[in-house]
């Protein structure tokens, strides 16, 4: 692909989004950017990982509110700079919002049936189904809260995306291949 592009991937917890994004980036021959983006920013603000987790959590304490906004703005700036330099896949980070007006962006949201997600989470983390359900609720709530706080939008609104894909019963490689084909068609069409 000659033209520069950006693929953003939002996802429900337990859909295999990280694996799908990793495989997609490999198929497209581009870099994947995800939560590791925060590492240099975390160091700059002299924050521990626990503090970053608190900032990103469902109910951050008042002390973190200003740091949280600064952290998000730094992260957004870094994501934009990286996307200006090269084609890439961005996992999470409210990418759909950051690149909402960018014609180079192909915005994807991955969802799946609850039982599929529960089984994946329980297997991956070696926990029972009840524990998996609680974790799914907690992570999805935290992601939705973060998204609404910084974008003013719900990540579940299909209008934010070019493609919303139910991955229930699909292998990550199949999903990544399908998204890659969509991206290639979009790029060639422009």
Tell where the protein language model's regions lie, with residue ranges.
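C-terminal helical "lid" subdomain and adjoining coupling/linker elements of P-loop NTPases
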Residues: 187-190
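Short, amphipathic alpha-helical "lid/cap" segments that border enzyme active or binding sites
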Residues: 76, 172-180
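Conserved phosphate-donor/acceptor-positioning beta-strand/loop module used by diverse small-molecule
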Residues: 101-124, 129-139
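Small-molecule kinase domains that catalyze NTP-dependent phosphoryl transfer to phosphate-bearing small molecules
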Residues: 52, 66, 128-173
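Glycine-rich phosphate-binding P-loop
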Residues: 8-22
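Extreme N-terminal starter segment of soluble prokaryotic enzymes
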Residues: 2-6
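ATP-dependent small-molecule kinase phosphotransfer cores
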Residues: 36-87, 94, 127
């Amino acid at each position: 692909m000659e033209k520069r592009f950006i693929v953003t991937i939002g996802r429900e917890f337990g859909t295999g989004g990280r694996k799908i994004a990793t495989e997609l980036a490999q198929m497209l021959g581009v870099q994947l950017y995800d939560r590791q983006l925060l590492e240099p920013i975390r160091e700059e603000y002299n924050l521990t990982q626990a503090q970053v987790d608190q900032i990103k959590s469902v109910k951050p304490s008042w002390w973190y509110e200003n740091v949280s906004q600064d952290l998000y703005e730094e992260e957004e700036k870094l994501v934009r700079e990286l996307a200006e330099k090269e084609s890439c896949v961005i996992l999470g980070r409210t990418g759909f919002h950051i690149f909402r007006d960018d014609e180079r962006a192909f915005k994807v949201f991955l969802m799946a049936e609850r039982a599929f997600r529960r089984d994946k989470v329980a297997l991956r983390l070696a926990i029972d189904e009840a524990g998996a359900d609680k974790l799914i609720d907690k992570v999805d709530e935290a992601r939705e809260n973060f998204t609404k706080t910084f974008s003013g939008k719900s990540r579940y609104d299909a209008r934010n995306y070019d493609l919303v894909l139910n991955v229930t019963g699909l292998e990550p490689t199949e999903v990544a291949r399908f998204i890659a084909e969509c991206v290639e068609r979009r790029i060639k069409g422009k």
